[in-house]
Amino acid sequence: MTKSELIERLASQQSHIPAKAVEDAVKEMLEHMASTLAQGERIEIRGFGSFSLHYRAPRTGRNPKTGDKVELEGKYVPHFKPGKELRDRANIYEG
């Protein structure tokens, strides 16, 4: 599901709310989550999961074109850990 699909689905389920208001709310929520992570804070949505930053240590990588070694700096990357309820619901899916 893309962000646009999420907005469309929410707008159709909440027909009393204008689609633009739904779009603005989704964008504002995602922006707030991104800025919270950028400040190094953890986000927990009970029953769904938590978002946090994990540190990736500096390492030696390779340039895929040339094969040359490249030193990569350490960095923080977003990490999502699903909650138990989400894990349980995902295990029902049989593709």
From Swiss-Prot:
Family: Belongs to the bacterial histone-like protein family.
Any one Pfam family match given in the protein's UniProt record, by short name: Bac_DNA_binding
GO terms for MF: DNA binding; structural constituent of chromatin
UniProt cross-references to InterPro entries, sorted A to Z: Hist_DNA-bd (IPR000119), Histone-like_DNA-bd_CS (IPR020816), IHF-like_DNA-bd_dom_sf (IPR010992), IHF_beta (IPR005685)
GO biological process terms, semicolon-separated: DNA recombination; regulation of DNA-templated transcription; regulation of translation
CDD domains (alphabetical): IHF_B
Subunit structure: Heterodimer of an alpha and a beta chain.
Keywords: DNA recombination, DNA-binding, Transcription, Transcription regulation, Translation regulation
Highest rank taxon of the organism: Bacteria
Name listed for the protein in its UniProt record: Integration host factor subunit beta
Reported function: This protein is one of the two subunits of integration host factor, a specific DNA-binding protein that functions in genetic recombination as well as in transcriptional and translational control.
GO CC terms: chromosome; cytosol
Gene from which this protein is expressed: ihfB
Originating species: Klebsiella pneumoniae subsp. pneumoniae (strain ATCC 700721 / MGH 78578)
